[in-house]
């Protein structure tokens, strides 16, 4: 029995989502929490899971996405939960409160979350202080940053670079007031990336949203083509999920969780066709199980990232996905995760029956 899903989660879900996160944050900031989780065998040590991600050696392809540890003050504990890497942030240069509450709504029936956080942050100085207290180096940190202008991007990038094994730059936020998405314009993005490359000493990944229409698709893939000109390591793909939601304080928000998985797969396929092996693709959106991870990697992702799945599945999610991936690779005679990447066309006829039903199994 999954103790988290059947005992702990029902109790936590009776609380306000932000109160629940505050409780989790308090626990994970505790110096002894790593010992609490460390005895549960959350790491799967197997060479078949190892990934080279833009020069970084990653022990497994399951990462914790940006947004859970916004201020980098839980990294010591999060590094003990079995993830191949952690993405703390988004770190902002200046402290900011984000949008007013309510700004998070759960949808348990769909295993989804609606949110309009608006990038709340304690600011760069606080994040640097917390990162300076990092005690472990067994799990890489890919620090995520965001900003409202060029100067803040560059100052935040330079300050964070010594503290992580890599950096991730998010080019927009759909729930931030007055964000017109200007950095998603190829010309504006190129101007920023010219300066980033001059300062770059670590691997750098760019995070952009997906798309829901053919017009958005053309624009986003055009942006990817422009970004490909730069000596960067990869791209993080998240679904485009902005919806009207009257229960949120600003009347709209993003959807994360299971409803977004098929869109994630579609975007990964498009970007993989465009980039091939030139770039690493990190898939983030609706990944809950090893079957989800398997599909995302065969579609072209190098790694997958968990956020909403962590909320619904609990602290064993990385272990469960990694163990399931090993089982699936054995079933389909795939040597390792690196060989699994982009293998969709090779094994596609064995993944689905004549009626399109999955032959993998519902959950692993």
Where are these regions (language model features)?
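Glycine/Thr-rich beta-alpha phosphate-binding loop at enzyme active sites
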Residues: 29, 36-44, 111, 174-187, ...
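Glycine-rich beta-to-alpha transition loops that act as phosphate-gripper elements at the mouths
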Residues: 66-69, 144-148, 208-214, 277-291
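Glycine-rich phosphate-binding active-site loops on the catalytic face of alpha/beta enzymes
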Residues: 87-93, 170-175, 234-241, 287, ...
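N-terminal capping/small domains of soluble enzymes
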Residues: 1-140, 148
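Structural preference for beta-strand elements that scaffold enzyme active sites
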Residues: 61-63, 85, 140-144, 166-168, ...
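C-terminal helical cap(s) of enzyme catalytic domains, especially alpha/beta-barrels
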Residues: 95-111, 244-257, 311-334
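Alpha-helix-loop-beta-strand connector modules within alpha/beta enzyme cores
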Residues: 112-115, 121-138, 185-206, 252-279, ...
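Catalytic cores of alpha/beta
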Residues: 73-78, 152-159, 213-229, 273, ...
């Amino acid at each position: 029995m999954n103790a988290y899903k059947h005992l702990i989660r029902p109790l936590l879900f009776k609380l306000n989502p932000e109160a629940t996160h505050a409780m989790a944050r308090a626990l994970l900031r505790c110096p002894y929490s790593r010992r609490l989780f460390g005895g549960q065998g959350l790491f799967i040590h197997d060479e078949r899971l190892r990934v080279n991600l833009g020069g970084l050696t990653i022990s497994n392809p399951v990462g914790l996405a940006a947004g859970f540890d916004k201020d980098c003050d839980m990294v010591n504990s999060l590094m003990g939960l079995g993830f191949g890497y952690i993405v703390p942030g988004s770190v902002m240069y200046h402290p900011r409160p984000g949008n007013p509450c309510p700004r998070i709504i759960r949808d348990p029936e769909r295993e989804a979350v609606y949110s309009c956080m608006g990038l709340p942050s304690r600011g760069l100085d606080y994040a640097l202080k917390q990162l300076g207290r990092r005690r472990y180096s067994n799990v890489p940190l890919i620090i995520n940053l965001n900003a409202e202008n060029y100067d803040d991007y560059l100052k935040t990038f330079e300050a964070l670079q010594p503290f992580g094994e890599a950096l991730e730059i998010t080019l927009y936020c759909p729930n931030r007031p007055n964000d017109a998405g200007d950095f998603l314009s190829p010309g504006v993005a190129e101007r920023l990336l010219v300066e980033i490359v001059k300062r770059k000493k670590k691997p750098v990944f760019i995070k952009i949203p997906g798309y829901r229409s053919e017009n958005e698709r053309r624009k986003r893939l055009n942006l990817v083509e422009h970004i490909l000109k730069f000596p960067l390591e990869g791209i993080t793909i998240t679904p485009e999920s902005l919806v009207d939601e009257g229960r949120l304080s600003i009347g709209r928000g993003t959807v994360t969780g299971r409803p977004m998985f098929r869109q994630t797969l579609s975007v990964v396929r498009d970007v993989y066709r465009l980039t091939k092996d030139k770039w690493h693709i990190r898939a983030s959106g609706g990944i809950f199980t090893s079957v989800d991870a398997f599909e995302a990697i065969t579609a072209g992702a190098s790694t997958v990232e968990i956020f909403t799945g962590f909320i619904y599945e609990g602290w064993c999610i990385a272990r469960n996905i990694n163990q399931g991936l090993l089982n699936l690779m054995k079933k389909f005679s795939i040597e390792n995760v690196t060989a699994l990447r982009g293998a969709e066309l090779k094994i596609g006829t064995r993944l689905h029956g004549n009626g399109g039903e999955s032959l993998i199994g519902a959950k692993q």
